[in-house]
Amino acid sequence: QWQVDQTAFALASRYYWAKVNRLAEHPEAIAQPGPDAAERTDTRQFEEAPAAGRRMVVMTSDLFRAQQTAHAFADILGLPVTCDQRLRERSFGEWEGMTRAEIKAVAADDYASWKQHTGGETKHGVESRAAVGQRGADAVRALVIDSAYSDSTPTTLMLVTHGSWITATISNLLELDPDGMNALGGMRNACWCRLKVRHSVNGTPTEQPLWELEEYNKAPAIADSADWENGPTDLRGPHMPSWQPIVW
């Protein structure tokens, strides 16, 4: 939770304009003094701000841990959160919930194939990297052209999802081989990426949206000065497990 909250604070600061936009659209949510007060908050302060002309949409996987993360961010800014099954994590089939040691113990050859990106995990019902990347990219492309968000209002889509989904989806959008060993690295917990979408080149419309990866696997500044994986010592109790590096 510590990681999630630190990321939420950092991104809420970056996207504070979204709170102003929300209050401009819903002035009834602006706190007002009692009826006997000499003055009341002028809602035009929000309605006339440039931020009122923008839009932030927060969507999350319907899995619980993603919803927690989404609300940690959105609740600070007073934004609604919409669940979308298309943002669900990669399915790990028979291996769901197992540790790497447990998988290796029962399927050593297929575990090795998984490490080498040669697909042995799919024998156990695990969704392939290509499949999850296609599923995710289809969802992102559909959201970008959704009539609810594709009008002239500048819109930021905040998609809260899972590490394997993120890496595979971005790989697909950038036309990278998700099974290639020269690829995007795995996501750290509670980190973010930022994509910019373009619909034209030099004024000429493109058939499909074009994507620019502006940030990948980014964390708040505190991640560089604290134990990001385990949290500060004053937050750790004797029954909290310690994070262990993943050894492939």
Where are the predicted features?
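Acidic, low-complexity terminal tails and accessory targeting/binding regions
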Residues: 90-102, 149, 153, 171-248
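Preference for well-ordered, secondary-structure-rich cores of eukaryotic proteins
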Residues: 72-76, 93-116, 130, 138, ...
